[in-house]
C-alpha cells in the first residue's frame, strides 16, 4: 500500500465533546490520517486503522432518518426490490435507525447494527435487529437460526469494516444461491473528480472503485452485475452483486463503469498523486477565504457538523476562533462541540439567523436539500462557503 495523501492528525470523527469534557480538559485521541493505494488490488484505504469498538459504540450519533434525501432513496430502492426482486427474506448490514428496514414487513427482515444506542431505536419499533458487529461468527449464528437470505443490503457500512475478507466470507455464508447483495458506498472516481478529500476519515477505511471491489469479490466467487450511480453522499455507487454461477446477465452499466474508471486512471498511482496536489491547493484556498471573511469582521457559522467536516476543519485548522457555531438537526450532537476544533453545535430550529454573513456547509452532500430549506436566508443575500469541487463563496 503506497501512501499518497497525508491529512495530518485527526480526532475520531464522530466523538463530539461535551461541556464536561472541555471543563475537565479531557484529552482527545488523535490518529495520523494517511491514505494509500495498492497497485495490485487497486484498493484505496486509510493506512492507520482505528479499532471499530472505539468508533462504533453507545454514543454513535449518526441517524439516516435525519435526511429527507436518504429517506427518499431508501423508499425508492425498496419499491424496486419489491416489484422486481421479490425477496422472501432480507438482511441489512448496518441498519442504523431502521430507515431502510421500515419499508418491509418486520417478519421478513433482520437488521445488524453494532451501536446499541441506535439499535434500541429499531428495537422499540419491534424490528428484528441484532446489536453486534458483522463477521463470520455472527453470520454462522444467523444462518443456523434463520437460513439463507434472498437479498442482503448494506449502505455506507462495508467500507467501515477493516477485514474485507471476513466481510465477504460472511456474505457468502448467508446469501442464497440465486440471491443478490446490494452494496452502496461512496464512489472513488467521484471523490477524485469532486476533490472531496473529506470522504477520508477514521470510519471510512476504504473508498471503493469498481476495479478494486471486483478484485476482492472474485475471491469469493461473487461478481457485480449492475451498477447505479447515485448523487447521495457526494457521489455513490450502488453495486448489485451475485454469485458467479448465477445466470443473471451482467449489464452494460458495469462495462461502462469499468471503462470510465480505467480512462480516468484509477488503476494508476500517478492519478492519486495528482489528487494530492489538488487537495493541498484546496486547503490553501479555503483558508484564504476564511481569513478574508474574518478580516472584514464577518460572522461565520457552520451548517451540519458532519464526520466529513471533521476532516476539513482539522486539516485546515479551522476552529472556534473562525466559526462561531454549527447548526445541526441531530439531537445527539446538539449542545456538544466538534472533535478537535471545539466549535459549539447548536440545535437547528428552522432557518439561519439574519445576522449571519457566511455559512460553511459541512453537510455539502445534502446541498440541494439544505438550499431548498434556506430559501429565505439566500434570498436575503446570505452566502455559503463550500470546498467542493473547489473552495468558493456562493
Model-assigned labels for residue ranges:
Residues 1-68, 228:
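N-terminal juxtadomain amphipathic helix
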Residues 153:
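A conserved beta-strand element that flanks and buttresses the S-adenosyl-L-methionine
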Residues 178-186, 382-390:
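Conserved beta-strand signature within the Rossmann-like core of class I S-adenosyl-L-methionine
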Residues 86-96, 300-303:
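Conserved class I S-adenosyl-L-methionine
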Residues 165-180, 374-379:
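A short glycine-rich, Lys/Arg-flanked "PGG" loop and its adjoining helix->strand segment in the class I
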Residues 234-278:
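Flexible, glycine-/basic-rich loop-and-beta segments that form/coincide
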Residues 183-206, 210-213:
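Short, glycine-/aromatic-enriched active-site segment of Class I SAM-dependent methyltransferases
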